[in-house]
Amino acid sequence: MNAAKSEHIILISPVGDLSTELIEAIAGEIQRVFGFASAIDSILQDLSFARDHNRNQHHSTMILDQLAANAPARAIRVIAIAQVDLFIPILTHVYGEAQLGGTACIVSTFRLNEGRSGMNISRKYIDRIVKEAIHELGHTFNLRHCPEATCIMHYCRNEEDVDRKSDELCRYCKVMLEDEIIRINK
């Protein structure tokens, strides 16, 4: 991966109590895949503004808007890791959502960790959450869903799809990411 400018960071914003092991795993993959250092800072703690009481879920797009608005200037991207069940109006649930080519994305541990708390987490679930975190961050770097089933940018309908895909970008997506990072570093 091309060396990123040192002043650029990707901010990891945990919402609630999440395991240190999970956050460190996400930070390590951010460095490996995107070449950017990460920082950890909880910029949103209360997600009640996005709660839909009829669905008993949180509207992820509303959270993205707040994340982007509250991201510090030094963060070129911000990813929230939350434990709430997320949705967008056209789908019953989502594992995460991102602003395509934008600043913010979010991943929920809720369905990927089968409703367990963010502190009680196995390696299998850490791997799932990390894959989806990298997937959502990929969207912020203008990567679209990939038809290659093993690419980390492949769209997943269920947990088995997440388990099946690798933690790597396919050759095409890797080139697209490298081009985007060159553009950012100009």
Regions found by a protein language model. Give the residues of each.
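The catalytic-center signature of Zn2+-dependent metalloproteases
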Residues: G115-K186
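A structure-centric signal for secondary-structure junctions around beta-strands
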Residues: S6-I9, A75, G101, D167
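Fold-level signature of zinc-dependent metallopeptidase catalytic domains
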Residues: S6-L18
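Short boundary motifs at domain starts and secondary-structure transition points
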Residues: M1-K5
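Metzincin-family zinc-dependent endopeptidase catalytic domain
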Residues: G16-A133, R144
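Generic structural signal for residues positioned in beta-strands
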Residues: L11, V78-A80, C105-I106, I152, ...
